[in-house]
Amino acid sequence: MNYKEIEETLNQYNDWNITSISDDGRVNSQDSEGFVCEKINSILGITKIKTSNREKYDLYIKGGEDLKIVEPSSFTNTISFTKLAKMLNLKGNNNNSIFDSYQTKKNNGELKLVEDYVIVFLNKQTKKITIASLTELPEECIAVNPSNCIQTKIPTNRVERTQDEKFELVHNLFIDYINKRILTPAKNWEKLING
């Protein structure tokens, strides 16, 4: 089953039972994730495979998708700096190691998009699911946040991009985050990405 078929299958259900105990919507979403993931696994007949660095209730439909239970017009924290770096074929788990990897990969012409990031959005109002990769999202559904790297919101449509356009999108998000968050305290990036 491809993601479109999975989305259609899941949208036959509307009893997603989203918690609304807290005044904080993020808390309610997190409290609901376990139930929603278990229900998705049950509907799709998935025996969840827990890989390293996965939370108990993380989705694993095909490759570790990210479940977001959100209001239709709200941005939600989605992709960390290290995950964004990994998408671009970079190694490392902190600013310095990712900087070294970027420098090496850039000098060797090895910067490329090696994986996409799939998000399963559950709309709190309509109880409908939208499955989209980062590179399918329209630009107005993606924001760079200096504190949390990449935020996304539920798209009303998807964008088809070439492989080069997908790389440019992710690479530009990476650079935008560095310029907003890292560049001020770490000037060593400036010449490498902007010079």
Put a short name on every predicted segment.
Residues 1-55, 69-195:
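Nucleic-acid endonuclease domains
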Residues 59-71:
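Conserved catalytic cores of phosphodiester-cleaving nucleases, focusing on short active-site segments
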